[in-house]
Amino acid sequence: MAQEYDYIIVGAGSAGNTLATRLTEDEGVTVLLLEAGGPDYRFDFRTQMPAALAFPLQGRRYNWAYETDPEPHMNGRRMECGRGKGLGGSSLINGMCYIRGNAMDYDGWAKLPGLEDWTYLDCLPYFRKAETRDIGPNDYHGGEGPVSVTTPKAGNNPLFHAMVEAGVQAGYPRTEDLNGYQQEGFGPMDRTVTPKGRRASTARGYLDTAKKRSTLTIVTHALTDKILFEGKRAVGVSYLQGSTEERVEARARKEVIVSSGAIASPQLLQRSGVGPRALLESLDIPVVHDLPGVGENLQDHLELYLQYACTQPVSLYPSLLWWNQPAIGAEWLFNGTGIGASNQFEAGGFIRTREEFEWPNIQYHFLPVAINYNGSNGVKEHGFQAHMGSMRSPSRGRVQLKSKDPRQHPSILFNYMATEQDWQEFRDGIRLTREIMQQPALDPFRGREISPGIEVQTDEQLDKFVREHAETAFHPSCSCKMGTDDMAVVDGQGRVHGMQGLRVVDASIMPIITTGNLNAPTIMMAEKIADKIRGRQPLPRSTAAYYVAGEAPVRGKPMRDVTPAAQ
């Protein structure tokens, strides 16, 4: 006899945990939350210590470790596509950068038919609802939400301050809050870390409250194989429990909600018979509903590291040496303080590279050490780096099922750098970053350019560097987009077109990727749609002011002009 619940949520990640928590706030509403990974072990420093963020990306316990097909514009490289596995999903292994995106992202969504209630001022109350910011609430920030947000503090690494000042000296705006009135410019970067220095995943923030409720059933190591249908209505799921091949069925009285992320959500829909007819028929999967957009429109952020030697011994290089790590770990474990308590992304910025961009098209994360995001290729000396990436690439990829076997990864192609705009943005971005790095604020610290290296100057040389060294920022999205056009998969409430009792709620339903990291927007979307599912009135629209660049120039006069013309 299959167990029966009101709602079945597939995926205990940033969206799924938010939904499970909010839906079970209503008395008597029962929810089954299925997670293919394991628990979020609180004693495992790899997922709980912010500074250890590279560790989960190196293994398979917490990471699906997908790979792309050979990327045609990236020398045919198979590129990493890490996704979180375990309670918390990608909030269990991400870089913990709390960035909401630009107000214009959401106003842009709201111009699309059917998405009129996704303006920034409609979304802002849900960002606030989800958040508790350590320095207190205001018009932009919450004080009572499940997500702990920590702001950078005085006395942190001097390189953070110097990099922000260098951005301002290069002629760009200063902003005190990248999630407040004005995203554009350089400033401190908030992080999803608790006041005790622990990673604030959605498992910690949401599930710690909800899992005490008898109406919420959480099953880990449960890999969902298929959504079950009667006609066009979703009525349940079948999943594999543990490492066995035994299938367990569960029934949903109201809805099945797919929150498996931008790779696994389209994969599950396709495996269940909802997707492009030709693809399903080629795999001998009975077509429940021909929906051509499932798995299409895939987007991501691509980024580069520009690395510099540091002439003063202030970088985090010593913390990479094994003999220094026990003391760092002990301070974090017992006091929740020190290097271990920060993700070390405490400064960043957003700029427009050209006047034709209405809002920023480049994001910076600054890091006071020279190392790859996944912890590899650390430079054996004091150094620092800027992560520089383009925000709204016109390139589009896709996710396609390769097999009926739920354990086989799908075919993933982001089609990175497929347009001339991509190449222009990266060339501009590298050159502008070099101008920023040459400003007086970094004079006390700046040594030689380690990467790309000062000899890399022409368009052709820069393009070669991008092809060989650009990496994902781990922001896959948009593969089950909201909208009303022929390629839309869901409506503005996440309901799958042409189906009943079936929703998708996660980063895959974004129509266009947002300007920045995706964890905060994903949680916001789940908060907003949770109210729709519960039949509640939406939170009142915000009246907060927000910055629109309009005719404002991209930048002012730099303090030190280092362009070739000036030389």
UniProtKB/Swiss-Prot annotation:
It catalyses: choline + A = betaine aldehyde + AH2; betaine aldehyde + NAD(+) + H2O = glycine betaine + NADH + 2 H(+). PROSITE patterns: GMC_OXRED_1, GMC_OXRED_2. The keyword Flavoprotein applies. GO terms for molecular function: betaine-aldehyde dehydrogenase (NAD+) activity; choline dehydrogenase activity; flavin adenine dinucleotide binding. Its cofactor is FAD. Pathway: Amine and polyamine biosynthesis; betaine biosynthesis via choline pathway; betaine aldehyde from choline (cytochrome c reductase route): step 1/1. Residues 182-203 are annotated as: Disordered. One of its GO terms (biological process) is glycine betaine biosynthetic process from choline. Keywords: FAD, Flavoprotein, NAD, Oxidoreductase. FAD binds at residues 6-35. GO terms for cellular component: membrane. It comes from the Bacteria. The active site is at H475 (proton acceptor). Its EC number is 1.1.99.1, 1.2.1.8. Belongs to the GMC oxidoreductase family. Involved in the biosynthesis of the osmoprotectant glycine betaine. Catalyzes the oxidation of choline to betaine aldehyde and betaine aldehyde to glycine betaine at the same rate. This is Oxygen-dependent choline dehydrogenase. It comes from Pseudomonas fluorescens (strain ATCC BAA-477 / NRRL B-23932 / Pf-5).
